[in-house]
């Protein structure tokens, strides 16, 4: 195991300065700080306090990374995980990345420093190549979001199929000008890409063309939904249906449509995703794709605890859970 002496030698910085960098001392030259950090990373150096944890007992703590704590999907998912963890004598640390690549890597560093025994990604911000090295420090399991580059356990739905079924419902209703909302395309997850592929395939199978103007990017929350509707209002050729990929975005569209000459669902049909509580409360009721959120959270945490309790090696496995189209008024 590397020591401060090794870091000092590799970086060409004195041991006392290395120590100040490790302890986040404010009076350290930035150039020296960068050299020390680079040497620590190259050597895989773990500070003494964390190294002691490495040699000692496990923390029985699991970090769960999400992107937006205010999203009801994540709160339901984490609640299910927490129930399983508590019953098994483990505790959960909730890490809210706010969509930041830097925050995600900071939280992931909890695994390297042995402050947690394992990490569950319910959202992914960085590319897998940046995350993969941390498998050397403990198990990582994916829940909800995923990437084809991994060979680790994953618990999710078939987003291609769910998107296909939602689009097919529009087509059966006679809709021909169908739009799509999707999230951030720069993320390391395949979720948004697979939804778009399922959407396009349904159109192709029924000989419908897709207008790129009806693809609304980076739409993830209520306000984004309002902005989507505002864009639709300004279009000369408008979509007659939009698959939003999010109940939050869908309710934003519906809310913004009130008082407009474009009515939901007569002029614009909408389908959400998740089946959050608001889907059954809003008027008109929101047609949406129901995800088995509780089951997904429970199975993910159960698998992580099984790995940790039995000290098992990670084996690539994908558990696909079933979705359901809930037809309401939109």
Which residues fall in each region the model found?
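Amphipathic helical "hinge" segments at domain boundaries
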Residues: 34, 46-110, 114-117, 196-200, ...
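N-terminal helix-turn-helix DNA-binding module of bacterial transcription factors
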Residues: 1-60, 73
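Hinge/beta->alpha junction and helix N-cap segments in small-molecule ligand-binding domains
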Residues: 67-75, 95-102, 155-165, 181-228, ...
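Short beta-strand segments enriched in small/hydrophobic residues
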Residues: 17-20, 54-70, 177-186
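Flexible loop/hinge segments that line or gate small-molecule binding clefts
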Residues: 121-165, 209, 248, 274-286
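Short acidic capping loops at alpha-helix termini that bridge into adjacent secondary structure
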Residues: 177, 210-214, 263-269
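Flexible loop/turn connectors
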Residues: 229-330
């Amino acid at each position: 195991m590397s020591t401060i002496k090794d870091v000092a030698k590799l970086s060409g910085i004195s041991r006392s300065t290395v120590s100040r960098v490790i302890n986040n001392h404010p009076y350290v030259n930035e150039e020296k700080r960068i050299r020390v950090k680079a040497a620590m990373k190259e050597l895989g150096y773990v500070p003494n306090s964390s190294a002691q944890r490495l040699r000692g007992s496990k923390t029985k703590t699991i970090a769960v990374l999400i992107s937006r704590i205010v999203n009801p999907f994540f709160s339901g998912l984490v609640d299910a995980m927490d129930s399983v963890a508590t019953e098994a004598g483990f505790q959960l640390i909730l890490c809210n990345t706010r969509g930041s690549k830097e925050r995600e890597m900071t939280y992931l560093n909890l695994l390297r420093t042995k402050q947690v025994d394992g990490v569950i990604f319910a959202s992914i911000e960085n590319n897998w190549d940046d995350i993969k090295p941390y498998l050397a420090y403990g198990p990582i399991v994916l829940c909800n979001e995923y990437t084809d580059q991994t060979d680790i356990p994953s618990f999710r739905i078939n987003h291609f199929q769910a998107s296909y079924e939602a689009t097919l419902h529009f087509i059966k209703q006679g809709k021909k000008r169908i739009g799509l909302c999707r999230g951030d395309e720069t993320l390391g997850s395949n979720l948004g890409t697979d939804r778009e592929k399922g959407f396009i395939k349904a159109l192709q199978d029924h000989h419908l063309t897709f207008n790129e103007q009806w693809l609304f990017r980076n739409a993830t929350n209520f306000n984004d939904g309002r902005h989507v509707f505002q864009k639709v209002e300004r279009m000369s050729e408008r979509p007659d249906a939009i698959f939003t990929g999010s109940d939050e975005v869908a309710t934003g569209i519906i809310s913004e449509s009130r008082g407009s000459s474009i009515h939901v669902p007569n002029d614009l049909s909408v389908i959400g995703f998740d089946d959050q509580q608001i889907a059954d409360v809003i008027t008109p009721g929101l047609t949406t794709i129901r995800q088995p959120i509780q089951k997904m959270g429970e199975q993910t945490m159960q698998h992580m605890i099984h790995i940790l309790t039995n000290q098992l090696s990670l084996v690539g496995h994908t558990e696909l859970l079933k979705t359901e189209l809930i037809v309401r008024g939109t």
